[in-house]
Amino acid sequence: MKLFILTFLLYFLISPSNLQLLINVRNQGGDVVQETITANVSEDTVTLEFLRTDGVFVSQIVDFANEVEAMKVVIPAEEELGQTGVQTLCFLTHAAQADFIAPDAMAKLRQKNPGTVRVAEEARGWRQTTATASGARAVALLSSPAARHCAQARDKVYLRQADLARWAPRPGLDQSSYGSLVTPFPARALDTDGAALPPCVSETDRGKECICHLEVCVNWYPCGLKYCKGKPQGGLSYRCGIKTCHRCYRYHFYVQFRHNCYNYT
């Protein structure tokens, strides 16, 4: 019995645990925004959330086990534009080379000076995604954490069909199963030879179809580990910190009616 208790205590003390960090971040406009970063070791996920100064809520999850990244954006209505309620969108992308450090490494971080306002060390520019299909039915097969994350978006879950070929087949399914669970956008929405649908920002008829765009910037996140050389000179290297980055995302997606595009950037 004593051996069991000792083993349990050792496991509890040395095993990675979940971690939540509250980070004060200065955005591009100079305002301070609080980010919440959660590492879930048991699910192998990292989640980052923040509320923008314009009222838009952003929540990003990276599922390392299934190589799925889901960006959820909750947009409040502008009544003067005839909008009502909130609109929730979710964008799925392949995450084999995710920017975030892994959950087990994230869970070992210790926050110093929690009141400090942070600025990212490295700007990683823009990542542009043009969605080609609705993936609301496929998300549950691709990633259970992402499915829960995107549940509020309902049918407004978007992805690129090119990413379907990059996701490894799940147990009991072949690669073609994904294709049957997505709804491609109309061919005219994917036309790139100059006859494509107009962007919603320039379409004045609320009842016309168009291409909506959305921009999201994540101003601070742990994007890598730092290693230092041990002493004396030539000693073994050891982990001595994290590298932090800033990245912006631009999403393009088809909407059947102009009024379904809440124009936030």
Regions found by a protein language model. Name each.
Residues 2-19:
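Cleavable N-terminal signal peptides of Sec/SRP-targeted secreted and luminal proteins
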Residues 5, 29, 113-115, 121, ...:
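Sequence-pattern detector for short linear motifs
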Residues 49-105:
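An acidic-aromatic
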